[in-house]
Amino acid sequence: MNYQIKRNTEETQLNISLANNGTQSHINTGVGFLDHMLTLFTFHSGLTLSIEATGDTYVDDHHITEDIGIVIGQLLLELVKTQQSFTRYGCSYVPMDETLARTVVDISGRPYFSFNSKLSAQKVGTFDTELVEEFFRALVINARLTVHIDLLRGGNTHHEIEAIFKSFARALKISLAQNEDGRIPSSKGVIE
């Protein structure tokens, strides 16, 4: 199933669709580094994204990065609501040379976000690295997930951020995998 949201504000214009089918993604945010990270996210999560985005990047990349996180989170929430069953929990460690990142995901219906990741530099190219946390916070809260992201070892900032995106993607893929018994993985019988 394909989920789509068009979101237009005074700051950004977004047309984003998401599918859980692992086909080729098309990502055009106008922010090269973010495009790169989202491409890695789709590859390692098995999700397909189509993103056409424009915005006030002449100011900086904050609005477009955060708004894309918001919409991807909303799309993930729709995916989870319609999925017959899922594993719920996922954890992934991802090394990238000297860097090691860990992400733990719970599709809980209770939004909580912990980002214990001191990045080594304030910029990668022109991209403000503080936006990594803003992107994931927006995604997690809007998807109603519990997520803990920890950068355990670092060095090169590009490697740090890449390991974070990949570890999140792989943990999410595990948590979205179909549950073997076909039931909702909650003693309540429901995740809201």
Curated annotation (Swiss-Prot):
Keywords: Amino-acid biosynthesis, Cytoplasm, Histidine biosynthesis, Lyase. Pathway: Amino-acid biosynthesis; L-histidine biosynthesis; L-histidine from 5-phospho-alpha-D-ribose 1-diphosphate: step 6/9. The keyword Lipid metabolism does not apply. SUPFAM superfamilies: Ribosomal protein S5 domain 2-like. One of its GO terms (cellular component) is cytoplasm. InterPro entries: IGPD_sf, ImidazoleglycerolP_deHydtase, ImidazoleglycerP_deHydtase_CS, Ribosomal_Su5_D2-typ_SF. It is found in: Cytoplasm. It catalyses: D-erythro-1-(imidazol-4-yl)glycerol 3-phosphate = 3-(imidazol-4-yl)-2-oxopropyl phosphate + H2O. GO terms for molecular function: imidazoleglycerol-phosphate dehydratase activity. The keyword Hydrolase does not apply. GO terms for biological process: L-histidine biosynthetic process. Its EC number is 4.2.1.19. Belongs to the imidazoleglycerol-phosphate dehydratase family. HAMAP family: HisB. This is Imidazoleglycerol-phosphate dehydratase. It comes from Staphylococcus epidermidis (strain ATCC 12228 / FDA PCI 1200).
